[in-house]
Each structure stands twice: as structure tokens, then as C-alpha cells.
Amino acid sequence: MTKLATSINRLAFDLFPKLSRAQPGNLVFSPASISFALSMTWGGADGQTAKEMQQVLHFESSSSEVMEASGKLIAALTDRSRPITFRVANQLFGEKTYPFEPSFLSQTARAFGAPMQQVNFKTAHEPTRRLINEWVEQQTENRIQNLIPNRGVDSETRLVLVNAVYFLGDWAAPFDKQRTQPNPFHLSPSNTISVPTMSRTGSYRIASKDGVTALELPYEGNDLSMIIVLPDAVDGLDAALSSMDETRWRELTNGLSHESVWVSIPSFKLEPSAPMRLSTPLRELGMRTAFDRRNANFSKIANPPNPQDRLYISE
């Protein structure tokens, strides 16, 4: 799983600058979720399509090995014995009249727990869209609604692959709500606002390197954590983001060690926004053929006799 984690982190740092340019302001996305979904698709790709996907996803093993490692990682993340809730749900929604390859369906079901639900895109695509959105809402405790917008699928849709991630956890060392108070927060060197700020003193793992400081905040159970990276300079955010990659991230996090730390961070809430369009950044990274209707090769997912009915990724 270590190789897979490295691949996911590399994809994260490839995508982050492209997504942040396309969506100014705060940005939240799950590189693991993207990797899981695309690895299922890669397992059904062949030829140039598969080659480009493998390079962009930084996979160094065979598709079967990546799928097996992904399944093990998902199982580790969703261990129900932990005091936190972490769900990773995968599902395939396929046109009931389409000739999907049984080997692909069994592979995704075995590795990802992603069975195929047969649906009617051809003549009932709008009810099917609502069905998929209801499934996502159920898996995410209604946090993600209307994932597929109006006209997001049509009568030509043959397969929708959905990956939903839901996390709920408390800090291992909770912040006292009564100590939350307004404090200045620097949006930029010239723009400071007042925000509710929570604070506490405790023993945390912390590291400083190359103009940034990383702080690890563990969740209850201490198996999962959030790592916050803060530039040392008020105007250092752009430089920190542009220089960070998987190698520097690994060096920074490998240097984490326990110290007594006064932690002061803004109260924040993560909420889903409009769905991100990944086609443009993935094309820019080199995954072009998968989005090309004429040249995409997903013959291991399905190989219909009519070339016009072959699969490609639309979004």
C-alpha cells in the first residue's frame, strides 16, 4: 500500500495547482477518491488510453495489483473498530442493455466492493440520475446532494462510476469551545480579517522545513490525523504551494516530532460545493485519449460491435 499512497500523493500535488486556478478561493478535494475511481476505469483500459492513465496516476504496478492495493487501503481506512466514521463507497451504474465484460465487473466488485447496478439510461436517464444522487446522499449522510446535475447524464450514457467518501471524527485532544475567540487572520499581507479562533496547548508532532511549518492534529483513536501546513512568512503561501511536491511533502512529514505547542487555528467547516470538472486538468497532465470519443480504448470494460457505441470518459 505504500507505493499506492505515494502514487496518490503525487497525483494530489499534480492536480492541486490546476484545480486551485480553476476554482479560486478555498479548495477541498480527495485525491484518494479520484485515484480509486480512475484506477477502476484504468483496469478496463487498453493501448494508448491505458498508458496515459498509468502515467498520470503514477501507477508502477499492474492494474490487478493496483486494484488489490486500493481495496486493502479502503479496508484499512474504513476499519469499523475505530472511534471515528470513515466510509468509502464505490458503485457502478451501467446501462442494462450494454455488453459489459464479466471479467471487468467481477474485478471491480472483488477489489473495490463496487457491484454493477443495472439502470435504464436509454429511455429513463432522468429517473436514473435521481437514483444515483439518492445513493450518494445515503452514503454521505446527506452531505453531498445533487452530485450529478440536471442534464448530467443522457440517453447516450452507458456507465457512471461513483466513489463517495464520508468522514466524521473528533479530535483526540478536543478544543474547549469556551476558549474560542475572535483573532486576526491574514488572507494576504495587506488583507486581515477577524475570525473565530480555537486554541489549546498540548504535545503535538510538528516540523519546519523550507519556509513552512507542519502540525499534525490527530483524531480520536490516533490512527488518522489532519496535517496543517503554514508558511512561515505572511506572504509565503504562493511560494509554499508552488514548491511543494510529493518528495518535499514526504521529507516534511517524516520530520514530524513531538513538542509542546500552543495551537491557534480558525474554526472551520468543510462543506461540498459544486462538482469539480476533472477533464481539463487531467488532459493537461497527459490523460487525453480517455476523453477522445473516437480513440478511447476501454475494450476491457466493454467491446460493443458498433464503434459509435464504445466507451469514453465524458467528465
Model-derived features: positions:
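Extracytoplasmic/secreted cell-surface and envelope-processing proteins
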Residues: 49-53, 236-238, 272-274
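Short Gly/aromatic-enriched secondary-structure transition segments
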Residues: 53-57, 175-184, 238-247
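Acidic/polar, low-complexity extended loops/arms that serve as protein-protein interfaces
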Residues: 241, 250-251, 258
